Amino acid sequence: MVKERKTELVEGFRHSVPYINTHRGKTFVIMLGGEAIEHENFSSIVNDIGLLHSLGIRLVVVYGARPQIDANLAAHHHEPLYHKNIRVTDAKTLELVKQAAGTLQLDITARLSMSLNNTPLQGAHINVVSGNFIIAQPLGVDDGVDYCHSGRIRRIDEDAIHRQLDSGAIVLMGPVAVSVTGESFNLTSEEIATQLAIKLKAEKMIGFCSSQGVTNDDGDIVSELFPNEAQARVEAQEEKGDYNSGTVRFLRGAVKACRSGVRRCHLISYQEDGALLQELFSRDGIGTQIVMESAEQIRRATINDIGGILELIRPLEQQGILVRRSREQLEMEIDKFTIIQRDNTTIACAALYPFPEEKIGEMACVAVHPDYRSSSRGEVLLERIAAQAKQSGLSKLFVLTTRSIHWFQERGFTPVDIDLLPESKKQLYNYQRKSKVLMADLG
Protein backbone atom coordinates (compact mmCIF):
# COMPACT_ATOMS: atom_id res chain seq x y z
CA MET A 1 0.00 0.00 0.00
CA VAL A 2 1.40 3.38 -1.06
CA LYS A 3 0.99 6.09 1.55
CA GLU A 4 -0.39 9.44 0.43
CA ARG A 5 2.16 12.23 0.35
CA LYS A 6 1.09 15.31 2.31
CA THR A 7 3.06 18.01 0.51
CA GLU A 8 1.21 20.88 2.20
CA LEU A 9 1.93 19.40 5.62
CA VAL A 10 5.64 19.13 4.84
CA GLU A 11 5.85 22.68 3.49
CA GLY A 12 3.86 24.05 6.42
CA PHE A 13 6.11 22.32 8.93
CA ARG A 14 9.25 23.58 7.22
CA HIS A 15 7.96 27.15 7.33
CA SER A 16 6.89 26.86 10.97
CA VAL A 17 10.17 25.52 12.39
CA PRO A 18 11.91 28.94 12.62
CA TYR A 19 8.95 30.28 14.59
CA ILE A 20 8.92 27.27 16.91
CA ASN A 21 12.55 27.98 17.78
CA THR A 22 11.94 31.73 18.11
CA HIS A 23 8.92 31.38 20.42
CA ARG A 24 10.38 28.71 22.74
CA GLY A 25 11.02 30.15 26.20
CA LYS A 26 9.14 33.38 25.48
CA THR A 27 6.22 34.65 27.58
CA PHE A 28 2.85 35.15 25.88
CA VAL A 29 -0.23 36.64 27.52
CA ILE A 30 -3.45 35.34 25.94
CA MET A 31 -6.72 37.20 26.49
CA LEU A 32 -9.94 35.20 26.14
CA GLY A 33 -13.14 37.20 26.35
CA GLY A 34 -16.29 35.57 27.61
CA GLU A 35 -17.61 35.58 24.03
CA ALA A 36 -14.71 33.37 22.94
CA ILE A 37 -15.38 30.94 25.78
CA GLU A 38 -19.04 30.63 24.74
CA HIS A 39 -18.18 29.94 21.09
CA GLU A 40 -18.26 26.42 19.66
CA ASN A 41 -14.61 26.79 18.58
CA PHE A 42 -13.40 27.24 22.17
CA SER A 43 -12.39 23.58 22.53
CA SER A 44 -10.06 23.95 19.55
CA ILE A 45 -8.61 27.16 21.02
CA VAL A 46 -7.87 25.37 24.29
CA ASN A 47 -6.21 22.51 22.41
CA ASP A 48 -4.03 24.98 20.53
CA ILE A 49 -3.06 26.68 23.80
CA GLY A 50 -2.04 23.26 25.11
CA LEU A 51 0.05 22.76 21.97
CA LEU A 52 1.84 26.08 22.53
CA HIS A 53 2.64 24.98 26.07
CA SER A 54 4.09 21.70 24.78
CA LEU A 55 6.42 23.72 22.51
CA GLY A 56 8.01 25.42 25.51
CA ILE A 57 6.12 28.72 25.39
CA ARG A 58 5.43 30.34 28.79
CA LEU A 59 1.71 31.10 28.91
CA VAL A 60 -0.46 33.38 31.00
CA VAL A 61 -4.15 33.03 30.09
CA VAL A 62 -6.53 35.82 31.11
CA TYR A 63 -10.25 35.17 30.77
CA GLY A 64 -13.19 37.55 30.82
CA ALA A 65 -16.79 36.85 31.73
CA ARG A 66 -19.00 39.69 30.43
CA PRO A 67 -21.71 37.61 28.70
CA GLN A 68 -21.69 35.02 31.50
CA ILE A 69 -22.07 37.76 34.12
CA ASP A 70 -24.89 39.40 32.15
CA ALA A 71 -26.66 36.04 31.82
CA ASN A 72 -26.29 35.45 35.56
CA LEU A 73 -27.69 38.90 36.34
CA ALA A 74 -30.63 38.30 34.01
CA ALA A 75 -31.34 34.91 35.57
CA HIS A 76 -31.52 36.56 38.99
CA HIS A 77 -33.53 39.54 37.66
CA HIS A 78 -30.81 41.95 38.74
CA GLU A 79 -30.49 44.97 36.47
CA PRO A 80 -26.89 45.69 35.34
CA LEU A 81 -25.66 49.20 36.09
CA TYR A 82 -23.06 51.12 34.08
CA HIS A 83 -21.42 54.51 34.40
CA LYS A 84 -19.19 55.81 31.60
CA ASN A 85 -19.28 52.32 30.04
CA ILE A 86 -17.89 50.74 33.23
CA ARG A 87 -19.91 48.18 35.19
CA VAL A 88 -21.01 49.31 38.64
CA THR A 89 -20.50 46.23 40.84
CA ASP A 90 -22.77 46.44 43.86
CA ALA A 91 -22.81 43.71 46.52
CA LYS A 92 -25.43 41.58 44.71
CA THR A 93 -23.65 41.95 41.38
CA LEU A 94 -20.33 40.99 42.98
CA GLU A 95 -21.75 37.68 44.21
CA LEU A 96 -23.02 36.88 40.72
CA VAL A 97 -19.69 37.97 39.17
CA LYS A 98 -17.83 35.63 41.52
CA GLN A 99 -20.17 32.77 40.60
CA ALA A 100 -19.66 33.28 36.88
CA ALA A 101 -15.89 33.78 37.16
CA GLY A 102 -15.45 30.82 39.49
CA THR A 103 -17.39 28.50 37.20
CA LEU A 104 -15.31 29.61 34.22
CA GLN A 105 -12.06 29.14 36.12
CA LEU A 106 -12.92 25.54 36.95
CA ASP A 107 -14.14 24.86 33.41
CA ILE A 108 -11.06 26.36 31.71
CA THR A 109 -8.70 24.58 34.13
CA ALA A 110 -10.37 21.26 33.36
CA ARG A 111 -10.23 21.86 29.61
CA LEU A 112 -6.57 22.89 29.67
CA SER A 113 -5.72 19.86 31.80
CA MET A 114 -7.12 17.53 29.14
CA SER A 115 -6.18 19.64 26.09
CA LEU A 116 -3.51 17.19 24.90
CA ASN A 117 -5.80 14.16 25.05
CA ASN A 118 -6.39 12.50 21.69
CA THR A 119 -3.04 13.84 20.47
CA PRO A 120 0.39 12.17 20.25
CA LEU A 121 1.18 14.04 23.50
CA GLN A 122 -1.61 12.26 25.39
CA GLY A 123 -0.46 11.58 28.92
CA ALA A 124 1.59 14.75 29.20
CA HIS A 125 0.43 16.69 32.25
CA ILE A 126 -0.35 20.40 32.12
CA ASN A 127 -0.28 22.13 35.48
CA VAL A 128 -2.70 25.09 35.57
CA VAL A 129 -2.17 27.57 38.42
CA SER A 130 -4.40 30.38 39.65
CA GLY A 131 -3.86 32.57 42.68
CA ASN A 132 -3.82 35.99 44.27
CA PHE A 133 -1.06 37.29 41.99
CA ILE A 134 -2.94 40.57 41.54
CA ILE A 135 -3.82 42.99 44.32
CA ALA A 136 -6.80 45.22 43.50
CA GLN A 137 -8.10 48.55 44.70
CA PRO A 138 -11.50 50.22 44.23
CA LEU A 139 -12.24 52.55 41.34
CA GLY A 140 -13.94 54.77 43.89
CA VAL A 141 -16.50 57.49 43.15
CA ASP A 142 -16.84 59.38 39.86
CA ASP A 143 -19.35 62.19 39.28
CA GLY A 144 -21.18 61.11 42.41
CA VAL A 145 -21.44 57.48 41.25
CA ASP A 146 -19.86 54.88 43.54
CA TYR A 147 -18.42 52.01 41.52
CA CYS A 148 -18.62 49.87 44.68
CA HIS A 149 -16.75 46.62 43.95
CA SER A 150 -15.52 47.57 40.49
CA GLY A 151 -11.77 47.87 40.79
CA ARG A 152 -8.43 48.33 39.13
CA ILE A 153 -4.99 46.84 39.61
CA ARG A 154 -2.92 48.12 42.50
CA ARG A 155 0.07 45.84 42.03
CA ILE A 156 1.13 42.55 40.46
CA ASP A 157 3.37 39.94 42.06
CA GLU A 158 5.33 39.27 38.88
CA ASP A 159 8.04 37.32 40.73
CA ALA A 160 5.49 34.76 41.92
CA ILE A 161 4.07 34.45 38.40
CA HIS A 162 7.56 33.95 36.94
CA ARG A 163 8.21 31.18 39.46
CA GLN A 164 5.09 29.36 38.28
CA LEU A 165 6.05 29.84 34.62
CA ASP A 166 9.59 28.64 35.37
CA SER A 167 8.11 25.47 36.85
CA GLY A 168 6.26 24.77 33.59
CA ALA A 169 2.77 25.79 34.68
CA ILE A 170 0.17 27.74 32.74
CA VAL A 171 -0.99 30.70 34.84
CA LEU A 172 -4.75 31.32 34.61
CA MET A 173 -6.15 34.68 35.70
CA GLY A 174 -9.81 35.71 35.97
CA PRO A 175 -11.61 39.04 36.42
CA VAL A 176 -11.87 38.92 40.22
CA ALA A 177 -9.00 40.06 42.45
CA VAL A 178 -8.69 40.86 46.15
CA SER A 179 -7.44 43.98 47.93
CA VAL A 180 -5.02 44.28 50.83
CA THR A 181 -8.06 44.45 53.12
CA GLY A 182 -9.45 41.15 51.79
CA GLU A 183 -12.27 42.64 49.71
CA SER A 184 -13.05 41.24 46.25
CA PHE A 185 -13.18 43.48 43.19
CA ASN A 186 -14.39 43.06 39.63
CA LEU A 187 -11.68 44.01 37.09
CA THR A 188 -11.70 44.06 33.31
CA SER A 189 -9.85 41.29 31.51
CA GLU A 190 -8.30 43.88 29.17
CA GLU A 191 -6.64 45.73 32.05
CA ILE A 192 -5.42 42.48 33.59
CA ALA A 193 -3.97 41.17 30.32
CA THR A 194 -2.37 44.50 29.44
CA GLN A 195 -0.75 45.05 32.83
CA LEU A 196 0.43 41.44 33.03
CA ALA A 197 2.03 41.69 29.59
CA ILE A 198 3.82 44.89 30.62
CA LYS A 199 4.96 43.73 34.07
CA LEU A 200 6.07 40.28 32.87
CA LYS A 201 7.88 41.86 29.89
CA ALA A 202 5.94 39.50 27.64
CA GLU A 203 7.00 38.99 24.05
CA LYS A 204 3.38 39.01 22.89
CA MET A 205 -0.15 39.79 23.99
CA ILE A 206 -2.79 37.92 22.00
CA GLY A 207 -6.48 38.77 21.97
CA PHE A 208 -9.41 36.73 20.62
CA CYS A 209 -12.27 38.79 19.18
CA SER A 210 -15.22 38.14 16.88
CA SER A 211 -13.42 39.70 13.90
CA GLN A 212 -10.26 38.31 12.31
CA GLY A 213 -8.53 41.64 12.76
CA VAL A 214 -8.80 45.29 11.83
CA THR A 215 -10.07 45.88 8.28
CA ASN A 216 -9.51 48.69 5.79
CA ASP A 217 -12.18 50.44 3.71
CA ASP A 218 -12.18 47.54 1.23
CA GLY A 219 -12.84 45.01 3.96
CA ASP A 220 -9.34 43.51 3.79
CA ILE A 221 -7.43 42.63 6.95
CA VAL A 222 -4.76 45.16 7.91
CA SER A 223 -1.77 43.02 8.86
CA GLU A 224 0.06 45.67 10.91
CA LEU A 225 -0.78 48.82 12.81
CA PHE A 226 1.50 51.12 14.75
CA PRO A 227 0.15 52.26 18.15
CA ASN A 228 -0.84 55.71 16.87
CA GLU A 229 -2.77 54.09 14.00
CA ALA A 230 -4.50 51.68 16.39
CA GLN A 231 -5.38 54.59 18.69
CA ALA A 232 -6.94 56.42 15.74
CA ARG A 233 -9.05 53.32 15.02
CA VAL A 234 -10.22 53.24 18.63
CA GLU A 235 -11.18 56.91 18.56
CA ALA A 236 -13.04 56.47 15.27
CA GLN A 237 -15.06 53.59 16.73
CA GLU A 238 -15.80 55.53 19.91
CA GLU A 239 -17.17 58.38 17.80
CA LYS A 240 -19.63 55.83 16.40
CA GLY A 241 -20.66 54.84 19.93
CA ASP A 242 -18.59 51.63 20.04
CA TYR A 243 -16.88 51.62 23.42
CA ASN A 244 -17.02 48.00 24.47
CA SER A 245 -16.69 45.72 21.45
CA GLY A 246 -13.97 43.11 21.82
CA THR A 247 -11.87 44.73 19.11
CA VAL A 248 -11.98 48.20 20.67
CA ARG A 249 -11.22 46.88 24.16
CA PHE A 250 -8.26 44.88 22.93
CA LEU A 251 -6.86 47.71 20.79
CA ARG A 252 -6.91 50.05 23.80
CA GLY A 253 -4.82 47.59 25.76
CA ALA A 254 -2.56 46.80 22.80
CA VAL A 255 -1.69 50.48 22.33
CA LYS A 256 -0.70 50.79 25.99
CA ALA A 257 1.20 47.48 25.98
CA CYS A 258 3.24 48.28 22.87
CA ARG A 259 4.13 51.73 24.15
CA SER A 260 5.29 50.08 27.38
CA GLY A 261 7.64 47.57 25.76
CA VAL A 262 5.55 44.61 24.58
CA ARG A 263 6.92 43.90 21.11
CA ARG A 264 3.79 42.64 19.38
CA CYS A 265 0.08 42.41 20.17
CA HIS A 266 -2.04 40.16 17.98
CA LEU A 267 -5.77 40.44 17.29
CA ILE A 268 -7.32 37.24 15.91
CA SER A 269 -10.75 35.64 15.66
CA TYR A 270 -12.11 33.04 18.04
CA GLN A 271 -14.40 31.90 15.22
CA GLU A 272 -11.55 30.79 12.93
CA ASP A 273 -10.30 27.28 13.66
CA GLY A 274 -6.53 27.28 14.08
CA ALA A 275 -6.22 31.09 14.02
CA LEU A 276 -3.77 31.04 16.94
CA LEU A 277 -1.41 28.63 15.19
CA GLN A 278 -1.69 30.39 11.83
CA GLU A 279 -0.92 33.73 13.45
CA LEU A 280 2.14 32.52 15.35
CA PHE A 281 3.71 30.02 12.97
CA SER A 282 3.43 31.62 9.53
CA ARG A 283 5.25 34.57 8.01
CA ASP A 284 2.16 36.70 7.41
CA GLY A 285 -0.16 35.48 10.14
CA ILE A 286 -3.92 35.71 9.81
CA GLY A 287 -4.96 38.70 11.93
CA THR A 288 -3.73 42.19 12.82
CA GLN A 289 -0.55 42.96 14.75
CA ILE A 290 0.00 46.15 16.72
CA VAL A 291 3.74 46.74 16.69
CA MET A 292 6.24 49.42 17.65
CA GLU A 293 8.54 48.23 14.86
CA SER A 294 7.30 46.63 11.67
CA ALA A 295 8.06 42.98 10.99
CA GLU A 296 8.83 44.19 7.48
CA GLN A 297 11.81 46.44 6.77
CA ILE A 298 13.25 48.02 3.65
CA ARG A 299 16.99 48.65 3.75
CA ARG A 300 20.28 48.51 1.88
CA ALA A 301 21.54 44.97 1.37
CA THR A 302 24.70 43.65 3.01
CA ILE A 303 26.95 40.71 2.24
CA ASN A 304 24.84 38.61 4.64
CA ASP A 305 21.79 39.04 2.38
CA ILE A 306 23.29 37.36 -0.70
CA GLY A 307 21.77 33.96 0.07
CA GLY A 308 18.29 35.43 0.42
CA ILE A 309 18.61 37.47 -2.78
CA LEU A 310 19.81 34.44 -4.74
CA GLU A 311 16.90 32.36 -3.45
CA LEU A 312 14.51 35.11 -4.56
CA ILE A 313 15.91 35.76 -8.05
CA ARG A 314 16.93 32.23 -9.15
CA PRO A 315 13.40 31.15 -10.24
CA LEU A 316 13.04 34.37 -12.26
CA GLU A 317 16.43 33.81 -13.87
CA GLN A 318 15.44 30.26 -14.78
CA GLN A 319 12.28 31.60 -16.43
CA GLY A 320 14.32 34.13 -18.40
CA ILE A 321 12.66 37.09 -16.68
CA LEU A 322 15.91 38.28 -15.08
CA VAL A 323 19.46 38.20 -16.40
CA ARG A 324 21.48 35.58 -14.55
CA ARG A 325 23.87 36.83 -11.86
CA SER A 326 26.54 34.72 -10.22
CA ARG A 327 27.19 34.78 -6.49
CA GLU A 328 30.55 36.44 -7.21
CA GLN A 329 28.87 39.21 -9.20
CA LEU A 330 26.33 39.74 -6.41
CA GLU A 331 29.12 39.97 -3.85
CA MET A 332 30.82 42.71 -5.86
CA GLU A 333 27.58 44.63 -6.46
CA ILE A 334 25.78 44.06 -3.15
CA ASP A 335 26.08 47.74 -2.17
CA LYS A 336 23.81 48.60 -5.11
CA PHE A 337 20.93 46.43 -3.82
CA THR A 338 17.95 47.37 -1.68
CA ILE A 339 15.83 44.65 -0.11
CA ILE A 340 12.51 44.27 1.68
CA GLN A 341 12.78 41.76 4.49
CA ARG A 342 9.97 40.20 6.50
CA ASP A 343 10.81 38.12 9.56
CA ASN A 344 14.37 37.64 8.25
CA THR A 345 13.13 36.46 4.84
CA THR A 346 13.99 38.52 1.75
CA ILE A 347 10.69 39.06 -0.07
CA ALA A 348 11.72 41.73 -2.60
CA CYS A 349 14.85 43.31 -4.04
CA ALA A 350 16.05 45.84 -6.61
CA ALA A 351 19.37 47.42 -7.55
CA LEU A 352 20.43 50.91 -8.63
CA TYR A 353 23.33 51.21 -11.08
CA PRO A 354 24.28 54.88 -11.46
CA PHE A 355 25.88 56.48 -14.53
CA PRO A 356 27.03 59.78 -13.00
CA GLU A 357 28.39 61.36 -16.16
CA GLU A 358 25.03 61.11 -17.90
CA LYS A 359 23.15 61.79 -14.62
CA ILE A 360 21.07 58.69 -15.19
CA GLY A 361 20.52 55.48 -13.24
CA GLU A 362 19.35 51.97 -14.03
CA MET A 363 16.86 50.15 -11.82
CA ALA A 364 17.66 46.47 -12.28
CA CYS A 365 17.10 43.01 -10.82
CA VAL A 366 13.61 43.86 -9.59
CA ALA A 367 12.11 40.79 -7.92
CA VAL A 368 9.17 40.23 -5.56
CA HIS A 369 8.35 36.94 -3.85
CA PRO A 370 5.27 35.26 -5.44
CA ASP A 371 3.29 35.54 -2.18
CA TYR A 372 3.58 39.35 -2.27
CA ARG A 373 3.19 40.26 -5.94
CA SER A 374 -0.39 41.41 -5.49
CA SER A 375 0.73 43.95 -2.88
CA SER A 376 2.60 47.24 -3.19
CA ARG A 377 6.14 45.97 -2.57
CA GLY A 378 7.21 46.73 -6.14
CA GLU A 379 6.04 50.33 -5.79
CA VAL A 380 7.82 50.65 -2.44
CA LEU A 381 11.06 49.51 -4.06
CA LEU A 382 10.58 51.88 -6.99
CA GLU A 383 10.05 54.82 -4.64
CA ARG A 384 13.15 53.92 -2.62
CA ILE A 385 15.35 53.44 -5.71
CA ALA A 386 14.08 56.73 -7.20
CA ALA A 387 14.87 58.51 -3.92
CA GLN A 388 18.38 57.05 -3.87
CA ALA A 389 18.91 58.15 -7.49
CA LYS A 390 17.82 61.72 -6.72
CA GLN A 391 20.08 61.85 -3.67
CA SER A 392 22.96 60.80 -5.95
CA GLY A 393 22.26 63.74 -8.26
CA LEU A 394 20.67 61.68 -11.04
CA SER A 395 17.85 63.17 -13.10
CA LYS A 396 16.54 60.10 -14.94
CA LEU A 397 15.91 56.44 -14.21
CA PHE A 398 15.65 53.68 -16.80
CA VAL A 399 14.79 49.98 -16.80
CA LEU A 400 15.31 47.13 -19.24
CA THR A 401 12.41 44.69 -19.15
CA THR A 402 10.81 41.95 -21.21
CA ARG A 403 7.74 41.24 -19.05
CA SER A 404 6.84 44.28 -16.93
CA ILE A 405 6.46 46.95 -19.60
CA HIS A 406 2.92 48.00 -18.67
CA TRP A 407 3.68 48.00 -14.94
CA PHE A 408 6.44 50.57 -15.43
CA GLN A 409 4.39 52.60 -17.91
CA GLU A 410 1.60 52.89 -15.34
CA ARG A 411 4.17 54.44 -13.00
CA GLY A 412 5.47 57.17 -15.27
CA PHE A 413 8.00 55.37 -17.44
CA THR A 414 7.87 55.77 -21.23
CA PRO A 415 9.45 53.59 -23.94
CA VAL A 416 12.58 55.13 -25.47
CA ASP A 417 15.11 54.19 -28.11
CA ILE A 418 18.21 52.20 -27.20
CA ASP A 419 20.32 55.17 -28.32
CA LEU A 420 19.22 57.08 -25.21
CA LEU A 421 21.01 54.59 -22.96
CA PRO A 422 24.36 55.58 -21.43
CA GLU A 423 27.17 54.67 -23.82
CA SER A 424 28.67 51.97 -21.62
CA LYS A 425 25.24 50.36 -21.14
CA LYS A 426 24.46 50.58 -24.84
CA GLN A 427 27.59 48.57 -25.64
CA LEU A 428 26.39 45.77 -23.36
CA TYR A 429 22.82 45.68 -24.70
CA ASN A 430 21.73 42.12 -25.53
CA TYR A 431 20.01 42.26 -28.92
CA GLN A 432 18.97 38.61 -28.65
CA ARG A 433 17.07 39.28 -25.43
CA LYS A 434 15.37 42.35 -27.01
CA SER A 435 14.54 44.01 -23.70
CA LYS A 436 12.39 47.12 -23.91
CA VAL A 437 13.95 50.34 -22.62
CA LEU A 438 11.72 52.55 -20.47
CA MET A 439 12.76 55.82 -18.88
CA ALA A 440 11.33 58.28 -16.35
CA ASP A 441 12.27 61.79 -15.24
CA LEU A 442 12.95 61.98 -11.52
CA GLY A 443 11.78 65.60 -11.35
UniProtKB/Swiss-Prot annotation:
UniProt main location, coarse: cytoplasm
Keyword Cytoplasm: yes
Protein's cellular compartments: Cytoplasm
Catalysed reactions, as listed in the record: L-glutamate + acetyl-CoA = N-acetyl-L-glutamate + CoA + H(+)
PROSITE patterns linked: GNAT
A matching Pfam family: Acetyltransf_1
Residue ranges annotated for the N-acetyltransferase domain, each copy included: 296-443
GO cellular component: cytoplasm
Enzyme class: transferase
UniProt miscellaneous comment: The mutant strains shown below are all feedback-resistant (fbr) strains exhibiting enhanced arginine biosynthesis.
Stated name of the protein: Amino-acid acetyltransferase
Species whose genome carries this gene: Escherichia coli (strain K12)
Protein's gene: argA
